[in-house]
Amino acid sequence: PSDRFQTKHLIEALLKDEKPAYIRTGRNPVEDIYSEDNCPFEMDKATVIKEGTDVVLIGCGEMVRPCVEAAEILEKEGISATVLDMYCVKPLDTEAIIKAATNAKAVVTAEEHAPFGGLGSMVAQVVGANCPKKVVNVALPDAPVITGNSKAVFDYYGMNGEGIAAKAKEALA
């Protein structure tokens, strides 16, 4: 989940569900994306935070906030971005990905994970099979990484609003 409000909704939903579940959260506090009064949540469905036309930014967990920041940066440069909060990767909301990506020019995923076998790989498969276009994954390197709090690590690897916006512009070029 991307913030405390979404985490609360997710836990409440899981308490009513008989299936096994796994939740991954960071240990550091994160800035809220949602509020008590505005936290759209549907089990196993991505949340559209912002609708745009040029590029789709798909984040999960702590990487949703940098996607929102990237969309704000891009908007100042005349680039319209959709932002999807993909809080759940299993099952993956393929319908939301296809709907968002179909008319966009490119897709950028952002995840606190290695570049292989995670959100980026799954989104690339869905987009490639249904609405082919460039997919760029912003992720940790497939190698040992530096240690530190989330912000320090994300900034070091360009996994922040500026870095995601730059990757989106490269994908659109």
Describe the predicted segments one by one.
Residues 1-16, 172:
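Conserved thiamine diphosphate
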Residues 19:
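A short alpha->loop->secondary-structure connector
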Residues 16, 24-173:
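Thiamine diphosphate
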